[in-house]
Swiss-Prot record:
GO terms for molecular function: biliberdin reductase (NAD+) activity; biliverdin reductase (NADP+) activity; biliverdin reductase [NAD(P)+] activity; nucleotide binding; zinc ion binding. Keywords: Acetylation, Cytoplasm, Metal-binding, NAD, NADP, Oxidoreductase, Phosphoprotein, Zinc. The gene is Blvra. Zn(2+) binds at H279, C280, C291, H292. NAD(+) binds at R18, A19, S76, S77, S78, H79, Y97, S167. This is Biliverdin reductase A. Pfam families: Biliv-reduc_cat, GFO_IDH_MocA. Changing C280A: Reduced activity. Belongs to the Gfo/Idh/MocA family. Biliverdin reductase subfamily. Residues 1-2 form a propeptide. Its EC number is 1.3.1.24.
């Protein structure tokens, strides 16, 4: 990313919640200015402007010749529709995970991006975290016997953020990135809607027959936390040390996206990333089906 492009890519941010606000901030960073030009944001709320960034309508964003790129930072349930509209309009798309709440829809959108000759990038900042880098180093070259990854947090609205296997897909992405493609053995969902409590328990198997449990547990009073326990043929790992603040992970993700815009990522790397994303979305879809069958 050394040479500046002849023309900067005009960007619109769709959705200005937590992720969208971070994207707006990062687009003003000097590192972004060489390649990206923030044109405005789209929001269902009437905000007028935010920190001197103007609000524009969805229709204007889709039509604008100034806008080359859309950052989709809205709630997960709306991702598919926004991605489709912006790709159809000939724009490149960066979307916060999960890109869709169904495997089939994701396949359609990849095909549309290829047909339009546009970049479709699903954000995965969890792979840029210091905790993941620690785990990756610890796991490298070791054979897993069994392990577990449990995540706890406060309740999340399924209607807006999807079934737990989709809203929690960053944890599944960790497991797949650490241990390779996984097979689904079983999945159960315990729900107490009156208490806003849910617990999803998934059993997975590595290609070397190592067993993995993935648990997503959400309810009032549950603090946001990850618990890991991996047993290897050569020792075990029972916690991830506190590594402090993960700095600039959204900016680093944006750097990867810009490399794709500039055609600086190899076809092999793009194919491997897409394969991992689709494997995780496929597992999430299968987990959802299995849990619904048992209801």
């Amino acid at each position: 990313m050394d040479a500046e492009p002849k023309r900067k890519f005009g960007v619109v941010v769709v959705g200005v919640g937590r992720a969208g606000s971070v994207r707006l901030r990062d687009l003003k960073d000097p590192r972004s200015a060489a390649f990206l030009n923030l044109i405005g944001f789209v929001s269902r709320r009437e905000l007028g402007s935010l920190d001197e960034v103007r609000q524009i309508s969805l229709e204007d964003a889709l039509r604008s010749q100034e806008i080359d790129v859309a950052y989709i930072c809205s709630e997960s349930s709306s991702h598919e529709d926004y991605i489709r509209q912006f790709l159809q309009a000939g724009k490149h798309v960066l979307v916060e995970y999960p890109m869709t709440l169904s495997f089939a829809a994701a396949q359609e959108l990849w095909e549309l991006a290829a047909q339009k000759g546009r970049v479709l990038h699903e954000e995965h900042v969890e792979l840029l975290m210091e905790e993941f880098e620690f785990l990756r180093r610890e796991v490298l070259g070791k054979e897993l016997l069994k392990g577990s990854l449990r995540f706890t947090a406060s309740p999340l609205e399924e209607e807006r953020f999807g079934f737990p296997a989709f809203s929690g897909i960053s944890r599944l992405t960790w497991l797949v990135s650490l241990f390779g493609e996984l097979s689904l053995i079983s999945a159960t969902l315990e729900e107490r809607k009156e208490d806003q409590y849910m617990k999803m328990t998934v059993q997975l198997e590595t290609q070397n027959k190592g067993l993995l449990s993935w648990i997503e547990e959400k309810g009032p009073g549950l603090k946001r936390n990850r618990y890991v326990n991996f047993q290897f043929t050569s020792g075990s790992l029972e916690e991830v040390p506190s590594v402090g603040v993960n700095k600039n992970i959204f900016l680093k993700d944006q750097d990867i996206f810009v490399q794709k815009l500039l055609d600086q990522v190899s076809a092999e790397d793009l194919a491997a990333e897409k394969k991992r994303i689709m494997h995780c979305l496929g597992l999430a879809s299968d987990i959802q089906k299995l849990c619904h069958q048992k209801k």
